Amino acid sequence: MLEVRDLHAAYEGKEALHGLSFTVAQGVCVCLIGANGAGKTTTMRCLSGLLRPTHGTITFAGANITTLSPAARVAAGITLVPEGRRVFAPMTVRENLEMGAYRRLWPRRHSTVAADFDFVFDLFPRLRERTGQLAGALSGGEQQMLAIARALMSRPRLLLLDEPSMGLAPLVVKDIFATLRRLGEMGVSMLLAEQNTRMALRTASRGYVLAGGLIVQAADATTLAGERAVRDAYLGV
């Protein structure tokens, strides 16, 4: 589904990615793990169209999307849940969710969008209770739920998640990742960039370890979780 080949990118004038190559198959969750500054967010920005690579190709569903705009990538089926959540604070929960479905609300296909509301409220029942509440008044965990739900309202073919555990309490992180695993069981294709290596490897079926803008190790998630170097560097055991 997604194929990245020899991806290079610069951030603030310095090269941040040095030739990344990886794939995400349809219906699979893949994780990018590594310390802060490893290149995870830069990779996500390139994939979502927010940052233009300096070299390399990004292919999605057989089409070269390397130079497509963010809007064109959303239209193609790629949706990003950004680092830091970035909900629309002055808008209600429902209005935030409608923003995720704007491409279908604009032609007034409300019947299909209604089913999506039911889907995300089933995943995140707390949001149903807060549909009229301003997003800025939600807790950090509720805002992360909203950010994921908003992305799902676009019916993505590939869901990109950048550091979904950042700044959240451990119990909230546990709930968020339980929902991500549920999405994986439903066959939702996901690419997860995450510093919480333990949770990422429990959720994904395959992982890539990033360091200094390079992929330094790649294997199935179970193998990576058992690697001594990965445990020492990222799992704290």
Language-model regions, residue ranges each:
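Conserved ABC transporter NBD signature motif
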Residues: 56-64, 76, 111-117, 219
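The feature captures the beta-strand-to-loop junction immediately N-terminal to the Walker
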Residues: 33-35
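Conserved catalytic motifs of ABC-family nucleotide-binding domains
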Residues: 155
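ABC-type ATPase nucleotide-binding domains, specifically the catalytic core motifs of the NBD
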Residues: 12, 68, 93-112, 123-125, ...
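Helix-to-loop junction immediately C-terminal to a conserved catalytic motif
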Residues: 48
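ABC ATPase C-loop
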Residues: 151-152
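Conserved ABC ATPase signature
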Residues: 134-138, 142
